[in-house]
Amino acid sequence: MGLLTILKKMKQKERELRLLMLGLDNAGKTTILKKFNGEDVDTISPTLGFNIKTLEHRGFKLNIWDVGGQKSLRSYWRNYFESTDGLIWVVDSADRQRMQDCQRELQSLLVEERLAGATLLIFANKQDLPGALSCNAIQEALELDSIRSHHWRIQGCSAVTGEDLLPGIDWLLDDISSRVFTAD
């Protein structure tokens, strides 16, 4: 029995996953996390540092790291990459002016060695706002079709209403499970 097999078996028992949620400031990362956890989302302030929540969902223990997206904090993102099973990239669909910045930051994450193999879920958040870009427009702006290094999916959602958060999370868990909890 090889080390990888032993590690997979240990991880299978725990069914514990580490999810890293990143994105530009004001994209809605903390709101998504709180909504998913059933918390009030009326009064949320910018994350200066990070939040960690441990949630149970579909028999998984999810350790979700929500890291602030202000420009001054982005250089610290790399401190959170270790052992990440899934990366959730949150996009403010109504913030057309920063799509290029958003694309640049995402592309720089995807070449990080410690994120290699992590499943990527892109939440196109704020779909409930007038003028929000469609998932197709965001897919094009972020050049998602060029991603070959990670399994990825874009999911439109609204953190405030909670609409379409679960389908995205469920896809992420299914994709990670197919890689991490494989039968030998």
From Swiss-Prot:
Lipid moiety-binding region (N-myristoyl glycine): G2
Keyword match Nucleotide-binding: yes
CDD domains associated with the record: Arl2
Keyword Magnesium belongs to the record: no
Pfam family of the protein (one): Arf
Location(s), subcellular: Mitochondrion intermembrane space; Cytoplasm, Cytoskeleton, Microtubule organizing center, Centrosome; Nucleus; Cytoplasm
Expressed in which tissues: Expressed in brain, lung, cerebellum, liver, kidney, hippocampus, spleen, cortex and heart (at protein level).
Cross-link (Glycyl lysine isopeptide (Lys-Gly) (interchain with G-Cter in ubiquitin)): K71
Listed GO biological process terms: bicellular tight junction assembly; centrosome cycle; maintenance of protein location in nucleus; negative regulation of GTPase activity; positive regulation of cell-substrate adhesion; positive regulation of microtubule polymerization; regulation of aerobic respiration; regulation of glycolytic process
Regions that span the bilayer: none
Protein keywords: Cell cycle, Cytoplasm, Cytoskeleton, GTP-binding, Isopeptide bond, Lipoprotein, Mitochondrion, Myristate, Nucleotide-binding, Nucleus, Phosphoprotein, Ubl conjugation
Gene Ontology, cellular component aspect: centrosome; ciliary basal body; cytoplasm; lateral plasma membrane; mitochondrial intermembrane space; mitochondrion; nucleolus; nucleoplasm
UniProt family annotation: Belongs to the small GTPase superfamily. Arf family.
Role noted for this protein: Small GTP-binding protein which cycles between an inactive GDP-bound and an active GTP-bound form, and the rate of cycling is regulated by guanine nucleotide exchange factors (GEF) and GTPase-activating proteins (GAP). GTP-binding protein that does not act as an allosteric activator of the cholera toxin catalytic subunit. Regulates formation of new microtubules and centrosome integrity. Prevents the TBCD-induced microtubule destruction. Participates in association with TBCD, in the disassembly of the apical junction complexes.
Protein's name according to its UniProt entry: ADP-ribosylation factor-like protein 2
